[in-house]
Amino acid sequence: MNSTLVIMGVSGSGKSTIGKLLAERLSLRFFDGDDFHSENNVQKMSLGRPLTDHDREDWLASLAELIVAEKPIVLACSALKKKYREHLSQSDISLRFIFLDIPYEVARKRLASREDHFMPVSLLDSQFETLQRPQNAINIQAEKSASAIVDELENFLS
């Protein structure tokens, strides 16, 4: 696998879970974009306030640097807007975006049951409002089990 894989989607779509499992199957390193948010961004989201494009600038720059430094990897990153995906794609590194497409109610249920995460359920509406569905991504229906999704991706990528 020569391409870096960016697992994208709204909060609760399964990016971290799928990313970890897929990285393990493909023997690649996994990174979670959530780990690269500044303390200010985490605090803002924890308070139920959505991030702005300006809030995301340094975060996206850090992820773009990571993509260049650690290639190939599996990266979980919301990448909700086209311009965020373009920012991550600025280098000559081959990227493949995998969009975990999930119905609102399924994502809401997952977020409500999630513990120890800074993203409150109240921000899910803003995630869906911000989402610009990717045109050139592998589109996966994410309400399936994690193992079924990873099997599907492994078959697709091989």
Range-by-range predicted roles:
Residues K20, E24-S62:
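Conserved substrate/cofactor phosphate-moiety recognition/catalytic segment
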Residues V10:
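P-loop (Walker A) phosphate-binding loop of NTP-binding proteins
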Residues D92-R110:
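Conserved phosphate-donor/acceptor-positioning beta-strand/loop module used by diverse small-molecule
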Residues K15:
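Conserved lysine of the Walker
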Residues I7:
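Hydrophobic anchor at the beta1->P-loop junction of P-loop NTPases
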Residues S113-E152:
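Small-molecule kinase domains that catalyze NTP-dependent phosphoryl transfer to phosphate-bearing small molecules
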Residues E70-I73:
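Loop/turn-to-beta-strand initiation segments
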Residues T4:
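Walker A (P-loop) ATP-phosphate-binding motif of ABC ATPase nucleotide-binding domains
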